[in-house]
Structures are given as structure tokens and as C-alpha cells.
A protein has these predicted regions:
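Extended alpha-helical, oligomerization-prone segments that build pores/tubes and scaffolds
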Residues: 1-177
């Protein structure tokens, strides 16, 4: 009797929490982020995490090395996105990582070493991409895994507010006028 081990690989949906302090939808999106042209997510990494990206597929090695050589940068935008509850420790140097979900021209995407076919481009719109930037350096570009170019985010609002995707939370609702 011979036993066989079979390995199956499949893509399954996953859900993650992203702080509202790290979410930047297109300001013109109204109350639905999917009506916007782009969505930007902010994250932070320490030097080891950035260094580990050098060997990861899809990352532009030279760009990651350039980000490491530049070191963690504190820009005015990055200081604006820092949530009040986050550590203000300046010794804990962190790299600011930005993920851009949106559309770019095919030529621009290919200039970032992303292989895309002519049929990846949506007519009069562009190529749906995800661009990863560390500090201000693009380090990775790939085709958005969502077939229609949608953003992989949904907001849960306790109470909707016209013109805002964030809505109003419970604390605001129970506040006296």
C-alpha cells in the first residue's frame, strides 16, 4: 500500500484590518471608495522588513537598495498620517510604505519592470495596478489582482454620511449636541 501526498495550491479570500488613519481614498469618491480613481494605503516597516524585500519576487532590487541607503524619511505627509495612539519614539526609525491602487498608462507600468500584456489595459482608463513605494521610491509594480480593477477595501460605517466614505462612529452618534 503506497501513500501519496498531494499538495493543493489555491487562492482564498482573506480579511485584514487597516486603520482608518492609514486609508486615503480619492477625495472625489463621495461616500463610496469604489467611485474614486485611486486608493492609497499607508504602512510602516523597519529596516529588516525592507531588506527582506530584496529577495522577494516582483520587487525592484535596485530601488529597494536605494530606499535602504536613503534611510527612513520623515516627510510632512507622513507626520500627518501618524495616528495619535502610535509611538512618537524617534529612535524607532520606520520606513513609510505607500500602496497605490489605481490606473496608470501601460508604458509607465512597464517602465517599473512590471510585465503587462496589451489586453491588461482597459480602454480609455489604463492598466489597473498596485504600486508599492518606500519613502518616495517606487519599489514594486504589479497588475491589480482584482479582475475589474476594484480596490481590495471595504469600509464598515455605523452610520453613513453623505459625501464621506468613513461615516460616523458610535462615539459621535451619542455625543450631545
Amino acid at each position: 500500500k503506497e501513500e501519496k501526498i498531494e499538495t493543493l495550491q489555491e487562492i482564498v479570500p482573506e480579511s485584514n484590518y487597516t486603520s482608518v488613519w492609514n486609508c486615503f481614498p480619492d477625495p472625489a469618491c463621495g461616500d463610496n471608495i469604489h467611485n474614486g480613481q485611486f486608493f492609497v494605503e499607508h504602512d510602516q516597516m523597519v529596516e529588516k522588513q525592507v531588506r527582506d524585500l530584496i529577495t522577494q519576487p516582483g520587487y525592484i532590487k535596485e530601488a529597494v537598495i536605494a530606499a535602504l541607503e536613503a534611510g527612513p524619511m520623515q516627510s510632512s505627509i507622513a507626520s500627518m498620517v501618524q495616528a495619535p495612539h502610535e509611538s512618537q519614539d524617534i529612535v524607532a526609525a520606520r520606513y513609510h510604505v505607500w500602496y497605490y491602487y489605481g490606473f496608470l498608462k501601460r508604458e509607465d507600468v512597464m517602465a517599473m519592470q512590471c510585465l503587462c500584456e496589451a489586453d491588461d489595459e482597459i480602454e480609455n482608463v489604463g492598466v489597473p495596478v498596485v504600486i508599492t513605494m518606500i519613502n518616495d521610491i517606487p519599489v514594486k509594480a504589479h497588475i491589480n489582482p482584482m479582475d475589474d480593477g476594484c480596490f481590495p477595501f471595504e469600509f464598515m460605517c455605523w452610520q453613513k454620511v453623505a459625501g464621506s466614505p468613513f461615516g460616523v462612529g458610535i462615539a459621535r452618534q451619542i455625543r450631545s449636541c
